[in-house]
Every structure is written in structure tokens, then in C-alpha cells.
Amino acid sequence: MGTLRRFPASVLQIALALFLLASGARDLVHVDAGVFNAAVYFLGGLFRGHVAIGVLTLAVSLCCLTAGFFLLVDFLRPELSCVSAVLALFVVLWALNMVLVDVVGAFGRGKVLQNVSSALEHLHHTAVDLLVLGALIFVRQHTR
């Protein structure tokens, strides 16, 4: 029965690990911050520099790769104790991204409510962010 209860968490953990690994690798190859791109450019604009954007992009990509790596390692070797701390840090990073992109960035530029298409696009992006945040929290609770 314990294995059957763990199955949904395992599937979600593998999916999340692959998503984060692929996102981090893609972001390094394409030199953008992927799902965090809007937040990186928002923060880069505050610091007024392309160097800040490059450093933030690299940091975000490495965070995605690190979180995905730890999730995959934890799936294969569940006795690893630092995974919960890494996931907690990534939950905070993801929530901060959501605030910066889905709230401050979107409504600050005033483009969300321009038309139905932009509102639906924003709603879709926010829903994806919430799904990933929920998956991170769920997997973190089940890796303890």
C-alpha cells in the first residue's frame, strides 16, 4: 500500500525533474532565463545593465538544473537529506518569479487587460506557474 500511495508523487517528481533539467539546459543553450525570463529582465532593468541580466540568467539556469538534478537523484536514492532544503529554496524562487512576472510585471506594463487574447495568455502563463509551484510543494512534502 505504501508504494501505491507514493506512485503519484513519484510520477510528479520525475516530471518536475525532467521539466527543470530541460528548462535549465535550454536556457543555458539559448542564453535566456526561460520561464524566469520576464523576472530577469525586470530585475535587470532595475539595475540598468546587460551584465546584471547575464548574471541573473546564468544563476536562474543553474538553479533550474540544480533543482532538477536533486529531484532526480532523490528519486533514485531517497535517503539524500538535502533535497527538502533545495526544494524549499526553489519554491521561494518560483514564488518570487510569480510575483515579479505574473503580478508586478504584467500589471505594471498594463498589457494584461488590453484585450481578451492578452488576458487569456496571461491567465495561461499564471496557471502553468501555479501548476509548477503546486508540484514543487507537493513533491517537497513527499520527499521528507
UniProtKB/Swiss-Prot annotation:
- Where do transmembrane segments lie in this chain? 7-29, 51-73, 85-107, 122-139
Q: Does the keyword Membrane feature in the UniProt annotation?
A: yes
Q: What does the entry list under GO cellular component?
A: plasma membrane
Keywords on this record?
Cell membrane, Membrane, Transmembrane, Transmembrane helix
Localization of this protein? Cell membrane
Q: How does it sit in the membrane?
A: Multi-pass membrane protein
Q: What is this protein called?
A: Uncharacterized protein TP_0638
What organism is this sequence from?
Treponema pallidum (strain Nichols)
